Amino acid sequence: MKETAKTTAKTRKAPKKPVGYQPRFSELDQYLFGQATHYDIFRKMGAHLDKKDGKVGAWFTVWAPHAAEVSVIGEFNGWDAHANVMRKVGEDGVYEVFIPGVTEGMMYKYYIRTPDGRELYKADPYAFASEKRPGTASKVAEIEGYRWGDSEWLTNRKKFDVQKSALSIYEVHPGSWMKHPWSESNPDGFYNYVQFAHSLADYVKKMGYTHVELMGIAEHPFDGSWGYQVTGYYAPTSRYGTPKEFKYLVDYLHKNKIGVILDWVPAHFPKDAHGLADFDGQPLYEYCLLYTSPS
C-alpha cells in the first residue's frame, strides 16, 4: 500500500447531500450505535459491495468523531485523498461514501485529517480482509454467498449441554502447528485454511477432541505475537487465505462434528500507525489513561 496519498492541509468540504439523499447508515443505525446496542454493526460499518443509481461499487462507512475530515484512499482512486471525501451522517461522528467502480479485492485505507492538521492513514477497523503483511491496507471483500454444509452440526449444537456432555478442547495456532517445507512460493511454510482444515480434522478426530480453539485468527501485523496484537477484529488473517476459505475451515470442522472456538483479544491492541490506537487522532477504541510518576 502506498503511504504517499495526495493530500493537503487545507480544509475540503464534503460533497453536499443531494435532495432526497438517503444515507446507508440510517437513523435507526445511528440510534442503535449511539446506544451501543447495534449488534450487527459489521453489516453497516466497513466496506460493502453494492449498487447505487445503477452503478456497481462499494459503500464505505467509518466512525471518526474527532476528525476534521475523512476520505477513502485506495488503488481505485490513486490513493488520492481529494477524490472520495466522506459525508458525515448524524451527530455521532459516522462518515460514509459510495464509490462506483470498486470491486472485490481492491486495497484501501481511510485518510483522516485531525483538527490540528495531522494526517493519518488508517486500516478499516471493520474490514473483512487485509493486505498480507508487511502491507497494512484493508481489502474489499464479499463475505456473502458461501454455501454452508453444517446444518446438522448447528441442529445438534442446540441440544449440547456443556454441564453434562464430554468436552475436550484442542488449542491450536495455525501458523506454527504444522508447516510445509520452505519454498519460494511459500517461504513461510504456512498451511492455507483449506489445507489446515483437512489436516486438523484428521488429527483432532484421531485424538478424541470435541472442539478446537483457534489462536491468532484476527488480523495482526507481527507473527511473533501469535495474534495477540490485533488490528482487524473482523478480518481472518490473510496469512492463511481469504474470508471464504476461513469459512471453509469452520464448515469442514463442523461437518466432522468438531466444534470451533475463537481465541480473541479484546483487552489490548498494538500502537501500529495503521491500527486502532488513536484512530482519529485521539483515543477512540481505547481508554485515555494518564499515568503519573510515583515520585
Sequence positions of predicted segments:
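Short, surface-exposed loop motifs enriched in S/T, G, D/E and P with embedded aromatic residues
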Residues: 81-89
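Conserved small/polar residues in nucleotide/adenosyl-binding loops
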Residues: 291-295
